[in-house]
Every structure is written in structure tokens, then in C-alpha cells.
């Protein structure tokens, strides 16, 4: 079983599921290619349990992202991606690629907080996030002391970046920057409580 022709929109994705020499059109009400991989695993488990493709694929439409894991909300004319449950270099890359793959009539903004508990590699790993930001966003708003390393890397490449260790100040900057049609991704370690910034976007 495999997926081909994955197409992401602002709040869902379609793909072709290939199984047993047949091709099926499938749809998920969430974005992020990792959800497609999860759907393929669920499909395989369903087949193993004796279900048919025709029974399994329509059930994909009932899939929901839980809690603060890549939950997409409309706030007026702005799309918010809430992914504030945790953060690691790998999950940062994944979430930023979701942002990059979304259709957008405005600009794409990455609002990112520190990745905590990375130890002596923290500065290097935070700086490394800059590469994924420049590929997938138009601007970055960074919160926390460790994100200063990412800010420096972005500034060296001439990328538009705002950074603060003051959450209220960064929130005010973000709210004055956002305009209709924009998409904003909010992600950081649980302890950074990035949802507190997202809550101010209305």
C-alpha cells in the first residue's frame, strides 16, 4: 500500500491510495504528510482485519487532529495552525513543511518558541531550524532565549525575523503584522505556552 499525488489545501489533503493493483481517491480533513502515513497504516490494519478498501477509505474523513497537535482554526480572515504540544528539531521541520505546503492568499508566518531540554546541542539545533523557516515561511516571530540562535541565523540570510523574550511584546508585534489571508503556525515546547500568543489572534 502506498500514497501518490498528495495535494494539500488550507485545511485538508487528497491523495491517491494504491493497493492491490487498484487506485483509490482518498481525503483527510487534516494537513501534514505524516497524517497520510498514519492513514496508510490504518488502511493496512483494516485490510488485515478483513475490511475492504471501500469500507476503510470513507472513514478517513472522520479523522481529527487532537488537542494542540497541528489543529487548524480560522480566526476571522487568518488561518491559525496550533501545534503547541511539544517541539523537537524533527517536529519543527515537519510542522514547517505543513505550513509550506498549504495554499495561502496572503503570507505565511512561523511563530516559534524555544525547544527545551536539548542540552549542549541546543544552540546549534535552534540555529538549524532557520533553514526550514526560510524554505516554508515569509516571516518568523521567535519567542525565548534559545531562539536567539535561530534569529541570528535568519538575520545572516536577510530573512524578516522578530525575536523577543517578552511574550506580550512579541504578541503585539505579531498582531500588528498579520493581515487577512495570512497563515500563522504556532509551535514550541509545552513549557513555552505558545497557545497564549495564538489566543490573541482573533
Where are these predicted regions, by residue range?
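ATP-dependent carboxylate-amine ligase
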Residues: 10-11, 20-27, 31-34, 40-202
Amino acid at each position: 500500500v502506498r500514497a501518490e499525488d498528495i495535494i494539500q489545501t488550507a485545511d485538508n489533503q487528497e491523495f491517491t491510495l494504491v493497493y492491490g493493483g487498484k487506485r483509490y481517491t482518498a481525503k483527510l480533513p487534516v494537513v501534514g504528510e505524516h497524517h497520510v502515513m498514519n492513514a496508510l497504516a490504518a488502511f493496512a490494519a483494516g485490510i488485515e482485519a478483513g475490511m475492504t478498501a471501500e469500507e476503510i477509505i470513507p472513514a478517513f474523513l472522520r479523522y481529527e487532529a487532537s488537542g494542540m497537535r497541528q489543529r487548524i482554526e480560522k480566526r476571522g480572515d487568518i488561518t491559525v495552525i496550533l501545534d503547541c504540544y511539544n517541539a523537537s528539531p524533527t517536529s519543527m521541520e515537519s510542522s514547517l513543511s505543513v505550513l509550506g505546503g498549504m495554499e495561502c492568499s496572503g503570507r505565511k508566518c512561523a511563530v516559534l518558541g524555544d525547544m527545551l531540554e536539548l542540552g549542549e546541542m541546543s544552540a546549534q539545533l535552534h540555529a538549524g531550524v532557520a533553514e526550514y523557516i526560510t524554505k516554508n515561511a515569509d516571516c518568523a516571530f521567535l519567542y525565548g532565549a534559545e531562539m536567539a540562535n535561530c534569529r541570528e541565523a535568519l538575520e545572516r540570510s536577510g530573512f524578516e525575523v522578530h525575536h523577543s523574550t517578552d511574550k506580550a511584546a512579541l504578541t503585539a508585534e505579531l498582531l500588528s503584522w498579520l493581515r487577512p489571508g495570512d497563515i500563522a503556525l504556532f509551535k514550541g515546547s509545552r513549557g513555552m505556552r505558545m497557545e497564549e500568543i495564538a489566543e490573541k489572534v482573533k
